[in-house]
């Protein structure tokens, strides 16, 4: 993720669009008519918005239906390794409001917010904080949880009404039933 974040932060909008367009054209040629595009490799407000702009341009130029997900809580950026809660503050207080404003101007469809809740990424309290803020901004919720160990993320997703939960490899049965 670290290398991809660096490359994404350095890329201009044209580069983001062209690289993504090639992938989208290939998927469409193989029969995919709906594609989810996620941000999450910029991890700054500016680069996350750039990724959303690239997706919106692709949506306007290509016949595929695009579902768009803001994944600013994909990983803790290197510059926040010593204090991940500062990054959560950035996501909640700066990124989510900026993304909501962007959505209101550029994206008429549902905008999703996803969080990677896992040891080494975002803990349960951080995930709750981000998802609750996203919901306040009118975003539909998604969560990647319990890939390696159960932190209770699946239960949190159910509690908050997430539309999807991914990974769930280590999710206990009682949390799946929630």
Regions inferred by a protein language model and the residue ranges of each:
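Active-site-adjacent C-terminal substructures of enzyme catalytic domains
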Residues: 140-141, 150-178
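Metal-coordinating catalytic core of metallo-dependent amide/deamination hydrolases
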Residues: 2-19, 25, 33-151
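Short intrinsically disordered, low-complexity coil segments enriched in acidic
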Residues: 1-5, 10, 160-162, 177-178
